[in-house]
Each structure stands twice: as structure tokens, then as C-alpha cells.
Amino acid sequence: MDRLLRLGGAMPQAAPPTDAPVVDTAEQVYISSLALLKMLKHGRAGVPMEVMGLMLGEFVDDYTVQVIDVFAMPQTGTGVSVEAVDPVFQAKMLDMLKQTGRPEMVVGWYHSHPGFGCWLSGVDINTQQSFEALSERAVAVVVDPIQSVKGKVVIDAFRLINPNMLVLGQEPRQTTSNLGHLQKPSVQALIHGLNRHYYSISINYRKNELEQKMLLNLHKKSWKDGLTLSDYNEHCSINEDTVAEMLDLAKNYNKSLEDEEKMTPEQLAIKNVGKQDPKRHLEEKVDKVMQNNIVQCLGAMLDTIVFK
């Protein structure tokens, strides 16, 4: 009975000491470019189902968690949950990664929420509890591959709040730094227990000069892309459609010239407001069809000479 009273905070022994250290919130999760790309690619491939995987990295200090790489887990998922981790596959995968020069430890796990934001469900909280039983600083990352667009990744990192702290009346966290910024919590995340059962950790992306060059060259076109031949049937149909559009634009341009002769200067100033400018569109179509045909003819001639 005494233990129950102490646990409930009804006795003086349950009061926390005033100088006791409180959990710090200055912690940041640094995710590498490779890990972020692999998480987004894995999440996009699993749509509309949830997917999950493990994050490899290191706990640099009390304020830094570095995620260097990730790998996918072969689990079955539904639209709203994923099952627990397979320990046998995890052990074999870590052994094989060590042989390839990837000795980092597991710092947490990630999973996708395709289309419904970043938060932890009841199943996710149970999975995170199993990770935090092995390491108190384990991180759960949630990524939304549907809402993520170029230049804005919808992602967030979470860690559970110790329920014993709330029972004893202690503050679960304290803010001692302004590094980084937290994601603005959504209504759905607050409904599912954000800041009650788990809290958010700020995420940062640390890139060196070589990684920036690699990312800039990821979808960069080379000189040979301009000489790639398109399918002749497709090229012919595109030419026919473009010429038909040019004919309509030429008729509209001729009609607009006739109308301009009857307009006053005030009417001429606003005649194209909110309307299609046939002259400009006609010039664009002519430039486009000339470029496509020149590249197609040049590529065909080069192929004829080279592979003769």
C-alpha cells in the first residue's frame, strides 16, 4: 500500500527534489542526405501501404543523434499500421552491413504515413517502447511520402514521454536551447497524443560540400540527352498536333489584327488582359517545333554516320 501511495504522489517521499536534472530539449536529429533519400524512396514505393525500416547512426553526445544510413524491413503493413520488427532479419542485416564497412549501431526506426501526416498511433507507440527498452534515446521518425514535395519534406521525429514523470508530477521536458525549430503540431497529431504520450524532436540536415555537389548532379542533364532520338511515330503525331495548334493560333492572330484596326488606344491597352495572346503562343509553338525537328534530324544523321 505504501508503494502505491508513493507512486501516486500522495506521500512526501514522491515529491521530486528541486535540483534534480530534467530531460533536455536541445537535442537534435541530424539526418544525412543518403538516409533521407532512401526513406522517401522506400515510402513512395510502398504507397498506399505503410512501410518501415531501421536507422543506423550514432549518439554523438547528449544533444546530437546522427542518422547516417537506413535499411528497409520486410514487414507486412496496412494503410494505418505496420507490424513489429523481425529480430532475425535485423541481426543478419547488421552483420552484412559491418562486412561492407557500415559499423554504425541502430539509433531508431522510421515508418511512413502515406497521406495522413506525422504522428504515432497506438501500435507505433508500442513499437517505440520496445526500442526504448533497448536504448532510452531511440528515435522514431515518421515520413509522409504523399504530402512531401520538392523542397519540403513532411517528416518528424518523436520520442516517448516517461509516464512515471507525469504520475509524480514532474515536468517531462525543459527548454534550454533555441537550436533548430520544431514542426508545428497538427490537430491530428495532438489528438493522437503529441505532448502527452510522446514529444517531437527537431530535425536538421547536415550536408558537406561533396554531398551538395552530388545532390545538384542527381537529375542534371548531360549533352547526350539532347541527341536522344524519340520514337518516330510519336514524333510525327506531336508534329501534326503542333501544326494544327499553330493553324488555330494563326487564325486567331489574324482576327486580332483585324480587330485592332477598329479599337481605340484605351481598348488596345487592355485587349489581352485575361485572354490568350495568340502572337506569343504562336512564337512559342514555332520555336518548339523547330527545336524538336532539328534535334531529331541531327540525331538521325549522326546515328547514320556512326553506325553505318
Curated annotation (Swiss-Prot):
SMART domains: JAB_MPN
Pfam family of the protein (one): JAB
Annotated ranges, domain MPN: 29-164
Keywords: Hydrolase, Metal-binding, Metalloprotease, Protease, Proteasome, Ubl conjugation pathway, Zinc
Xref: PROSITE patterns: MPN
GO biological process terms held by the UniProt record: proteasome-mediated ubiquitin-dependent protein catabolic process
E.C. number(s) listed in UniProt: 3.4.19.-
Residues the record lists as binding Zn(2+): H111, H113, D124
Function according to Swiss-Prot or TrEMBL: Metalloprotease component of the 26S proteasome that specifically cleaves 'Lys-63'-linked polyubiquitin chains. The 26S proteasome is involved in the ATP-dependent degradation of ubiquitinated proteins. The function of the 'Lys-63'-specific deubiquitination of the proteasome is unclear.
Record protein name field: 26S proteasome non-ATPase regulatory subunit 14
Naturally occurring in which organism (per UniProt): Drosophila melanogaster (Fruit fly)
Gene giving rise to this polypeptide: Rpn11
